[in-house]
Amino acid sequence: MRLIILDTAEYVGEWSAKYVMKRINDFKPGPDRYFTLGLPTGSTPLGMYRHLIKFHQQGRISFKYVKTFNMDEYVDLPRDHPESYHYFMWHNFFKHIDIDPENVHILDGNAPDLVAECDAFEEKIRAAGGIELFIGGIGPDGHIAFNEPGSSLASRTRVKTLAQDTLEANARFFGNDISKVPKQALTVGVATVMDAREVMIMILGSHKAFALYKAIEEGVNHMWTVSAFQQHPHTIMICDEDATLELRVKTVKYFKDCYKLSADGLEQATLRN
């Protein structure tokens, strides 16, 4: 596991976008070889999306031969609702780049058979050859996608009833009216993300510091689902300084030293000077 600690949330977004761009460009995707990318929603990846849009506009990256799979979607929320993840992705990312809509895969929370929708999503991932890079964020309780505390670490894409804490946290997006927050969602499972060849998890802010501590310094625990990625062979966790407040000083120093000595760290230091 790699932990990359950067000064600010803005720099996390920039670094993440550069990493995604490098992975796609190095892969050299084409009509017979698509790059498959797993994507999150929420405030955490917005900076990354903004930078990827900028890089695309500069001609530094194309998404023509990229297939995407999003992590989750609310149940019974219209696609054109401002809080639906379909709406979020199209308005914050997809409509600004050259991706073919046929290559975008987002779970349909209005499907007549939700279980069949989840099974079909897993099959689409398999048919695409699996996911090269799955990007995620986490909640203050360490959940990834809608795999909340207590979720099986062997879980696949499924229907999930949301916890009361999640409903209360998301009420701010629905006019602070908890009755308007969808009670269920479709979500990829922990094992779905673990199957990706590489996982990059973004953590921003002091309110997620305890979750990062649980993910890095303690053992694997289904009450902190992000901790499962300790066992993935290629996990990158990238965070800002505020997110490290619960980590031991020696832990922070160790990972900062590792980054400075890495090729990525040397390259980024050069870019910033």
Swiss-Prot record:
Keywords: Carbohydrate metabolism, Cytoplasm, Hydrolase
Entry GO terms, CC: cytoplasm
BP terms from Gene Ontology: carbohydrate metabolic process; generation of precursor metabolites and energy; glucosamine catabolic process; N-acetylglucosamine catabolic process; N-acetylneuraminate catabolic process
A GO molecular-function descriptor: identical protein binding
Keyword Hydrolase belongs to the record: yes
Catalytic activity: alpha-D-glucosamine 6-phosphate + H2O = beta-D-fructose 6-phosphate + NH4(+)
Enzyme active site: D72, D141, H143, E148
EC number annotated for this UniProt entry: 3.5.99.6
Domain of life: Eukaryota
Coiled-coil stretches noted in the UniProt entry, renumbered to this chain: none
CDD domains for this protein: GlcN6P_deaminase
Subcellular localization(s) per the UniProt record: Cytoplasm
Enzyme type, top EC level: hydrolase
Functional pathway: Nucleotide-sugar biosynthesis; UDP-N-acetyl-alpha-D-glucosamine biosynthesis; alpha-D-glucosamine 6-phosphate from D-fructose 6-phosphate: step 1/1
Quaternary organization: Homohexamer.
NCBIfam families associated with the record: nagB
Family designation: Belongs to the glucosamine/galactosamine-6-phosphate isomerase family.
Role description: Catalyzes the reversible conversion of alpha-D-glucosamine 6-phosphate (GlcN-6P) into beta-D-fructose 6-phosphate (Fru-6P) and ammonium ion, a regulatory reaction step in de novo uridine diphosphate-N-acetyl-alpha-D-glucosamine (UDP-GlcNAc) biosynthesis via hexosamine pathway.
Record's protein name: Glucosamine-6-phosphate deaminase
UniProt source species: Anopheles gambiae
Lineage: Eukaryota, Metazoa, Ecdysozoa, Arthropoda, Hexapoda
